[in-house]
Every structure is written in C-alpha cells, then in structure tokens.
Amino acid sequence: MLEKLFGFDASKHKVKTEVMAGITTFLTMAYMLAVNPNIFSSLASKGMDTNAVFTSTALAAIVGTLLMAFYAKKPFGLAPAMGLNAFFVFTVCLTMGYSWQFALTAILIEGFLFVLLTVTKVRTLIVDAIPATLKRAIGAGIGLFIAFIGLKNAGIIVENSATYVTIGDMTHGSALLGVIGIVLTSVLVIRRVPGSLLIGILGTALIGIPMNITSFNGIVDTPPSIAPIFCQFEFHNILTIDMVIVVFSFLFIDMFDTMGTLVGVCTKAGMMRPDGRIPGLNKAFMADAVATMAGACLGSSTTTTYVESAAGVAQGGRTGLTAFSTAVCFVVALFFAPLFLSIPAAATTPVLVIVGLFMLSPVKDIDLNNYAEAIPAFITIVMMPLTYSISDGILCGMISYVAINALCGNWRKLNVTICVLAVLFVMKYIFI
C-alpha cells in the first residue's frame, strides 16, 4: 500500500527513516509559522486578520505538502514562500496601494497560469533545457544560500553599513546558541547518530532554555478561524496593467525559485539521471501549481516548494512518505502552535549550515578545467547567496552560459530553449 500511495519501496526505503526525515523537514520549515503572520501584521490596519494568517499558513502547507506526497510522491515540503510574502505586503499592498484582496487575486491567477504551463509541460521543457553543469551548480548554490540563511537567522552574520555583512557577537545570545548547535550537530553527524539533524534541532532548542532564548508560551491552543480571509478575491481590477505586472512578478519569481529548489534537492537526493533529466518532475510542478491556487483561496501568499526540504533529504527522505510526515506535523502544529513556535530560529541554524555542506557535493562533478562550463556554474553558485535569491542565481548563470558559449563558438552546447530564455532574462533585468 505504501508503494502505491507514496512510491515507497521496502527494499530501498525504511519507514522510520522517511518519518524522521519528514519531521526534520518540518522543524526546519516551522519558523515560517511565526514569520509569515508577523510580516502580514503590517496589513492589520487594512483589515487582514493576523491570527487568521497563522491558520492559513499552516493549512496551505498541509494542502501543498499532501499534494506532493500523494500525487508527485516526492519528499518535499511546501508552504507560503518567504520573500514573495514580503513582495505581497510591502510592494503590492503598501507601495502600490492595492488591497490584500487584489494581491490574493493575482496569486490565484498566477497559480492558474502555473497549472497551464505544467499541463503543457513548458516548465519541464525549461528544466530539460538547462545543462547538467548548471543543474549541479544550482544545487550547490542553494546549499550556500540556505547556510547563509541559517547563519543570518542566528545573528552569526549581521548587517554592516560599510561591508554589507560582518560577523556578529558570538559571545552571547542567539549567535552563541547557533555556534553551540553547529558544534553539537556536527559531532552527531560525524558519529553517524540516527536522526542527528532532528536531535540537533531539539538539543539546541533545549540548550536555549537556560540562555533565555527558548521560551515556552503554552502548549495547546485552538486554531484561529480563517473566515476573515477565506476566498477574499477582487476581480474588478484584473485587466489593469498593474495586475499584469504583479501576476508576472509572482509567476516569474515563483517559477524559478521552485525550479531551482526541485532541481537542487532532486540532484542531492540522487534522483537526476545521467542525462540530466529528473523523473516525475512534472508531477512535482503540478503539485506546486495547484497548491498556489489552493493557498490563494485559503488567504495565503504564494505556496511553493521549500529549500529546507533538503534537510529531510539529507536525513534519508526519498519518497512521498517523507512529505506526508511533514504534512502531519503541520496538522499537529495547528493545535500545538505555542509549543512549536517556541523553537528559536537559532536552533535550526546547525541543520541549515550542515545541509548546505551536503548540497555542495555536486560541485565535484563539475569540470573546473573547462572554463566554458565552470565560469557559468560559479556565477550561478555565488550569485544565490550574494543576491539572496535562488531565481537571480539561475538567471545570471543561464545568461552567462549562453553568452560565453555563443561567443566562444560552442553553438552545439546551446539549444533553442535556453537561448530564448537567456534573451528573456536579459529583457527582464532591463525593463522590469
């Protein structure tokens, strides 16, 4: 039955490993249950219920992750996208002046367009057009990106007006807890302790109690109603230029963030074939697209596949059972919100850093002596953490790949799809 439901093969997979991987993925994603409502609190004065946002965030994660589990049978968690939620609140609503109902309508339309692109296999066509070298670079770039996120969340890396970033004060507070957690989790991983990443998160959170970083604000609570934001759409502005721009922006960022995440994590999980293709990728895209539409109905910003899924993959998750376990955790989180929200961001830092290391492994398969391949790969890798964007890393990498190989006369390496995409990406940077 497990094989039919989740693609589980008893000769290759273990139930315990898949479940532990799912829990690990959840714990690395759980921060958004606190962050997302906090970001949307800026719209409270415009009538968007912040408490309802918490419930919609969890429900969107549940629906999206279950779709990934049962339909795509992949070990990935989905939830409202961090970054796109800020675009929703601060750009569409607060800067452009549109209502949150307008923004939800844009997300619904974006999700519908995603479904069309997936049904016509346009998204799969784009992925297949990306050279294997860049796919490996995408995985490595995401590794650096999530490690950077982890270090930033703990305050180990902080802002600096002169150098943009610098090292934080690691003698106390979250930064110290993050450092302790990295050492603790590293030892567990090196000693091959089963469930080392999950134990690392929980152990770091417990250490944070006497440091006054981890604080428990209760255990059980009734989930707030989503009625105030459920299916709140505004269709009378859908033909405006602003709606087109907003929909395109959501679509563009979500498409390449999701594509980068799926390609990177699938590569790390050993799901990529020697020819660079990933079996079942179109189903994963469809799950992501439908989840975005469902999320809009629930009152959530764009729902997407989370890069933190790499934590579960690193823990051994390979099937839909991992995603199902993650979804179950989100169901539990609805009723144990105060408890789950007690896990500080610094407690997830060790996992994000170590998983970042794990995801660097595809670099060894990049031919660093072939500069026509190595330079675009390096640009892809380094631009993700430096621009704080997976999609920008992919775009810069693909533009440089086409430009370098075209000017060097390596036309046989290039296909029509990647050349067209490179031109579109250049136009995007010029005009948008």
Model-derived regions: residue spans:
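Helix-loop-helix junctions within the multi-pass membrane cores of secondary transporters/permeases
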Residues: 2-36, 60-61, 81-90, 94-142, ...
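Transmembrane alpha-helix interface/packing and boundary motifs in multi-pass membrane proteins
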Residues: 64-77, 186-192, 250-257, 288-298, ...
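Hydrophobic, aromatic-rich alpha-helical transmembrane segments
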Residues: 11-22, 46, 50, 54, ...
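Residue-level signature of catalytic and energy-coupling elements of molecular machines
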Residues: 19, 39, 126, 195, ...
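Active-site cofactor/substrate anionic-group-binding motifs, chiefly glycine-
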Residues: 49-95
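Helix-loop-helix hairpins and the membrane-proximal interhelical loops
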Residues: 1-52, 166-167, 199-282, 423-427
